Each structure stands twice: as C-alpha cells, then as structure tokens.
C-alpha cells in the first residue's frame, strides 16, 4: 500500500465496519450513494490507525443489505484488512458524481449557520440524520440540539458561499 499525502479535499464516503472473508475484503457502511457508484480501478484513500492515508485501488464491490463489501488490490488477506476497521474511506472531491440542482452532499452543509427568516440564529449544522423519509438537520446552539426537518417547506435557502441556511420553522418546533 502506498502512503500518500492528503489531497486538498478528501470527502468521507463510508466507514469500514469489519473485515469480510479471508481475502481481506472490507465491509463498509456507505454515506449516501457515492461509494456504490464507483467502478473497479477507482482509487480511494483510507486513513490508517497511525493517522496517515493509504491509496487503495477498488477491484470490486457488492451490496450486502445496507452495507457494501469492497475488495482492494492492495489488501491480500484479513491481516492486511484489520488495521482499517473503524476507519473512514475517502474520495477526492472531484471524483464524486455530480448532484442535481437543489441537492447537496452532506459534507457541504455541515458547518453552515442556520438562521430563521427573521434572522434569529439557531446555531450551526453539526450533523445530518437520514431517516428514510427526509433527512433531519441537527443544529447546535449553546450546548443544545435543535432538530430541523429537511423539507422544502422548512428549508428556504442554502447559500454555500455565505455558509448560511435560512429556515422557516413550524410554530412550536423550537422552545424559547
């Protein structure tokens, strides 16, 4: 496995949950659909326990329920796979599939300031919960979490340049 320096913008696309089989495949929980859309030959970056990154070449993947089982050219057996359990797998930003207008990769939204139509700050978007029906944005303000449904009636504007999201919350969603 070749050690590399971190490219300018690596985006996490999944997390290694365990090894799979004696040939060193990795069982990965994907963050969205970016990982599953990749083809054999694609190069990924995995963070190793020592903090560095290894470049790995995908030789194949298959779905197993919600998980993906991925084989990499550089990992030959379970002993070679074990150090990556619990680590995230990354792609360079320019290798991600494009998104439609009005859609955003989660990593682009994390860190946005969330404000109401009246300009009241609700905090910073810290994480996104995928619920199946619609995502839920988790804003953090003064140690409290505010859950915001990611639906068109609530999310009024996303401005990535200004790092801001404007929301119109239903009455009673946030206690005073």
From Swiss-Prot:
GO molecular function: ribosome binding
Coiled-coil stretches: none
Keyword Magnesium belongs to the record: no
GO cellular component, one term: cytoplasm
Keywords assigned by UniProt, alphabetized: Chaperone, Cytoplasm, Ribosome biogenesis, rRNA processing
Domain PRC barrel: 101-173
GO biological process, one term: rRNA processing
Subcellular location: Cytoplasm
Major subcellular location class: cytoplasm
Family stated for the protein in its record: Belongs to the RimM family.
Subunit (UniProt): Binds ribosomal protein uS19.
NCBIfam families: 16S_RimM
Protein role: An accessory protein needed during the final step in the assembly of 30S ribosomal subunit, possibly for assembly of the head region. Essential for efficient processing of 16S rRNA. May be needed both before and after RbfA during the maturation of 16S rRNA. It has affinity for free ribosomal 30S subunits but not for 70S ribosomes.
Notes concerning its domains: The PRC barrel domain binds ribosomal protein uS19.
Protein name (Swiss-Prot/TrEMBL): Ribosome maturation factor RimM
Organism, as annotated: Syntrophobacter fumaroxidans (strain DSM 10017 / MPOB)
